[in-house]
Amino acid sequence: MKYLLLVCVEEPPEPPLETAEEIASWDVEGEDIKPWLSEVDGGGIRLFGSQVSKPANASTVRVRDGEMIVSDGPFAETKEWMAGFDIIECDSMAQAIEIAARHPVAKFGMIEVRPFRPLPRD
């Protein structure tokens, strides 16, 4: 089964990581993410993942009564913000939680684990 790991932090890294070189050398609060990536990528667990840009670069899109409404910024204004995500394939929620617990950001941020749900088919 596929699971989404939402990688959340309370504050963005300072300065924000924007260039490919900065992202490639990212050291998470003294915790190098490369060993975790090697484990989950090498084990065929992680299907895809990425960091995402800071909340100030977000746009929120709604359609109400046929009209598109675009707002600058994220959907919710909170201290926590999504810094990235990973899509993993595991046998169970328990295994997905174990993988999330080993993510370096779990030591100072949080990892929300959500199972994928199939879309209804005609």
What do these predicted ranges mean?
Residues 1-122:
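Conserved, structured core segments of small domains
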